[in-house]
Amino acid sequence: PVTIVNDVNPIIMNNIKGNIEFDNVMFGYDSVDLENGKVENNILKNFSLKIENGKMIALVGPSGVGKTTLVQLIPRFYDVVSGSIRIDGVDIKKYELKSLRKNIGYVQQDVFIFGGTIKENILYGKPGATDEEVIGAAKKSDIHDFIMTLDEGYETIVGERGVTLSGGQKQRISIARIFLKDPRILILDEATSALDNITEAYIQKSLEKVIVGRTVVVVAHRLSTIQRADEIIVMSRDGIVQRGKHEELLAVEGHYSNLYNAQKEGFIR
């Protein structure tokens, strides 16, 4: 496991705007522990990108080009080999780790559900929140009505890894956590890719509510989910190969239109 440590005198992250900047970032899993800055098998090479606060940016491209890796660097699940990532102009390594992660919400395909109650699982987003706050978050993520059909309601034990819940219900709990946590930066990493199309459509409605007013970075496999993004970043092994809005990218022949048309044909078949 990779050990991430605080700076000597870390800055507590407070009242951030949510501007994110990747500056010449180099990263490779094989090179994380190498000494003397020696770099091998890098997934990200001299990667630079600015994300304005309050904007929704989508990362698309084939598997293995570093989309998930890139977003995992923001909360410092890993540290860059070289270059820097800045939030509001400050290198994220200078922020106190706990406060950095407190300001970042992360929704992924494989939702972490532990074997406690539904209420405890929602509280994971903000330990110590009131019952009213928990219920409010559940209503916003459209899972309150389902919870109220259960005999024990919010005190229902969900079983290890949420074995009693469907994929859609688990995802709604993870979205309720975000409403409760209320982070300035939100990462959606293939959040709906494990769901069927009908469930995905419902979850998208919950996600549309939770993204309002935040800086949002989306990793998307299904391109149908990111058409409203302020900017779509198309990645390949060589870095960024295209960028723009959905309509702009569809209008030209290139990586994005090829990906989009291939998926569209796949869905129609």
Short names for language-model regions:
Residues 13-269:
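ABC-type nucleotide-binding domain
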Residues 2-3:
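HAMP signal relay module
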Residues 8-9:
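Surface-exposed, proline-enriched loop/turn segments that connect beta strands in immunoglobulin-like
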